[in-house]
Amino acid sequence: VNIESIKNNSELFRFLSNFYEGDFEAFLDCVIKKPKSAIRVNTLKANKDTILERLLKQGFKLKKVAFYEYAFVVEESPVELGNTVEHFVGYYYVQSLSSLIPPLVLAPQPGEVVLDIASAPGSKTTQMAQMMENRGVIVANDVDIKRVKALANNIDRMGVLNTIITIEQGHKFGKLYPETFDKILVDAPCSALGTLGKNPEVVKWWSREKIGRLMATQKSLILSGFDALKPGGIMVYSTCTVTPEENEYIVNYLLQEREGVEILDFHLPGVKLTSGLTEWERLIFKKELVKCKRIEPHLNPGFEGFFIALMRKSPS
């Protein structure tokens, strides 16, 4: 991606320059760079030190990450990260720093019943299984059969044993399994503006009309997730985009449509989290949306743009 290609999509250019105002250049500089790769060391397969030792011996240079002890930024790699024996046997997962965060915020515990409503290809599912020490149950759902194959491969490769794969439209879970899950991750399909460095094709198809279609999916998924949550249960809604229409607007929609939604605050060591918006253009959102968090690439070098809302369903 370069600045010219963004300028060629006038709708996108107008949105980003309007949204970021004085930070527009800084945002573009960061988001169009492909971030350094990061890996999550998989303790379901071996202990951390064993895995690190094997990688360091081969000449990998790794840097610790403040917010998660099993994540490392790859400063130098002698071979492609996907081409090592260690990758093949599931000792690590190549995962962006931002995408490690929704599972950490959701914090599933061993023994809980968890739903990942749009889970393929499985970075967050396999991370949650690791956090749960392969105990309890994860229902990993996706509607796209091609992506489900990748999900199944990753679950297998990473030694995940506590996960059931379902191929169902996510918006049906609330009706099929009301008040069933302790924790739910709604990592919604989105316009991916936070990942332009990795997904330059977004610039070609991004439009207001496309956002409208995505919003319909996002609304149905957040309602379905909330309905499938037990009273007292915890849900995370996340996207890798920056548009308020796909983020704060969707959480605000849930607050309008359902009683008993509490937005919770959270912090992460070493990550600069920006507060959620309470207004955007002609839209006014509920005040508690300030507790939602944005990860802005220009404030967090090496991170992609991300949005995360942590919510609790009040005990009935």
Locations of regions flagged by a protein language model:
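S-adenosylmethionine
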Residues: 1-316
